[in-house]
Amino acid sequence: MLDMKYLRQNFEEVQQRLQHRGEDLADLDKFGELDTNRRQLIAETEKLKAQRNEATKKISELKREKKDAEPAIKEMREVGQEIATLDKQLKDIEEKLEQIMLSIPNLPHESVPVGEDEEDNIEARKWGEAPNFAFEALPHWDVATNLDIIDFERAGKVTGSRFVFYKGLGARLERALWNFMMDLHADEHGYQEMLPPYIVNRSSMTGTGQLPKFEEDAFKLEEWDYFMVPTAEVPVTNYHREEILGIDDLPKKYVAFSASFRSEAGSAGRDTRGLIRQHQFNKVELVNFVKPEDSYDVLERLTGEAEKVLQLLKLPYRVMSMCTGDLGFTAAKKYDIEVWIPSQETYREISSCSNFEDFQARRAGIRFRREANGKPEFVHTLNGSGLAIGRTVAAILENYQQEDGTVVVPEVLRPYMGGKEIIG
């Protein structure tokens, strides 16, 4: 959520920066009118309350002097009714303003490239060389099916499309990856491990920005108004909702493993086969709470921590700086890390690393004090995938496949695979 005071005082600047996102600014236009009405109502209400206070004093004086106070009492009642009417109008306007503020996306940082869509994203760096196979690379779903380590067909029978059974060495590979990632981030990158709930309430989804705008993308438990987590970012960020931290508490670094659930409402016909776009998938998530002045340095460090996973797995990748039109609702700046997928001869997203500045903290009420009695300030929050595990499995199956259909186990994973070097 943006700072309402900043929006009011810098309306044209905010409007211009949001135009770079390609956003519909209808809600922003409504803000100006409603905010003006709100301030007028507050002024009128304060004036009437002062009038009521004077009437109260007058009534007391009249009663002390044994004079007729009925006209003054009647006047005070009428003023009270006017105040009640204005208070109701004010409440209605403030509710509308809150919904508008919740629907306005974050402001892009000045370093974010201006552009319309993914075609305007800028490559920041590239690592590793794509494998040069002497045979035609198979897509990962064929590699996995031939090895009988992933079952897409039976998952479709049991649940439906975009679900999967891992089995045998496929399940072992998935488990090896999340243990490897959790160990790396906890032991080498200094994160505290978390295993969060997979179900969250509406306030949590609102705090991180999934609601109200993207409710159709979420899996909802209708009877309880609960939601399946789309990412561990939601429960872990809300771990400190409505809290005031001390300066010594920052930075806070949490790494969480969880299943993630997405409806993929806007993805009909895209990636209908394989592990790239599933309704349920496992992910390791990195969440940071930092002082505002540190957040952009932390974004670079966070992105490097996610990259380290791919480097140790020896998977070629590139880092893309997202343009304003492909930034997402909550991020002020975002990097996507994309891994090489040989069968598609392209890079595909495997991690997003974002700085939200105080956008989530303002929605979730997460603040800190620099001094014991100091004025609370909003923290800056950041998160990144470290990594999406299903997509990492896909990348390993494709980049490490051999002509005979077997798959080499990346060296760094072998201790997690009982020393196994080959799948097949």
Curated annotation (Swiss-Prot):
Pathway: Aminoacyl-tRNA biosynthesis; selenocysteinyl-tRNA(Sec) biosynthesis; L-seryl-tRNA(Sec) from L-serine and tRNA(Sec): step 1/1
Database matches in CDD domains: SerRS_core
Coiled coil: none
Gene3D superfamilies: Bira Bifunctional Protein, Domain 2, Serine-tRNA synthetase, tRNA binding domain
Main location: cytoplasm
Transmembrane regions: none
Function: Catalyzes the attachment of serine to tRNA(Ser). Is also able to aminoacylate tRNA(Sec) with serine, to form the misacylated tRNA L-seryl-tRNA(Sec), which will be further converted into selenocysteinyl-tRNA(Sec).
Record note on domains: Consists of two distinct domains, a catalytic core and a N-terminal extension that is involved in tRNA binding.
Subunit comment: Homodimer. The tRNA molecule binds across the dimer.
Protein name: Serine--tRNA ligase
Organism whose genome encodes this protein: Oceanobacillus iheyensis (strain DSM 14371 / CIP 107618 / JCM 11309 / KCTC 3954 / HTE831)
Encoding gene, per UniProt annotation: serS
